[in-house]
Amino acid sequence: MVATLRSLFARRFKEVPAVQDVSFDIDEGEIVGFLGPNGAGKTTTLKMLSGLLYPTSGEVRVLGYTPWRREQGLLSAITLVMGNRSQLLWDIPAADSLRVLQEIFQLSEHTYRASLDELTDLLEMEPLLHKPVRNLSLGERMKVEFAAALIHQPRVLFLDEPTIGLDVTMQARIRRFVSDFNRRTGASILLTSHYMDDVVALCKRVIVIHHGRLLYDGALTGLAERMAPHKLIRVTLSHEADLASYGEVVSHEENTTTLKVSREAAADRTAQLVHDLQGQMLDLTLEDPAIEEVIDRVFSEAQVALAAGV
């Protein structure tokens, strides 16, 4: 039966480039968001940058080193944090795992204690150090994971979904920690996350890739300006009013209406609203659409272009 099935079916192999023609530089002390849908090539890129994967073409340089050579000078200066992976020993206290890392990175007792004290203060994790890792909650474990990843005070951080699965409060704490660590040490950080709150809070610059290709590299604020053809006008009046003549009504709640207008017409429509509704207007804001909406539009347009062979 097995032989019969083998005669009916044959393996076919297809090469799918995970990353192609992606080129960027990151300055010292910069925090850059690295965005893309699942399967875009983000984790593959981080693995090449950290030396876990060998690039089949092109060149990768981090701090002057070629990552796949795994030289000690590079390994002692970088770290990779993956939200769904652990580098802690499951059955022993977190403090013992950190001691193991002290030996791996050959840290002096003075250097180790200074780094541990700083991380313990930043992460508020003193009560967690003497608990077996298996007894920690996900949020508690991520605190210790960060301590383990940063105990050697790396100059470059690759953060792959560091807040995945965490509650809103813990996400905010991790963001504050990353920001504080960057400010204190001047470390360069490349961050992937599907939580746009992470990106907005930490990154002034974003890189967007899709199907392994670079779509955008620039200021986060410029992403909406370049990719979103409309803006939102939110108007609050002293009484109910129909504002459909000024733009597309996106939402209406009590006396507050949100209008969608083309980017080119936004200034004129805003001025027109102020002129026509003076004496009735309590508040008016002009803003870009949410970053999630902009990113979704970028991916959708890229998918259409890919299907069309553009």
Which functions belong to the PLM regions below?
Residues R175-S262:
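ABC transporter nucleotide-binding domain
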Residues L157-E161:
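Catalytic Walker B motif of ABC-type/P-loop ATPase nucleotide-binding domains
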Residues V2-L8, R99, E103, T111-L128:
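Conserved ABC ATPase "signature" region
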Residues D91, P132-L136:
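Conserved ABC ATPase signature
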Residues Q153:
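Conserved catalytic motifs of ABC-family nucleotide-binding domains
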Residues K231-A302:
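Short, charged/small-residue-rich alpha-helical element at the C-terminal edge
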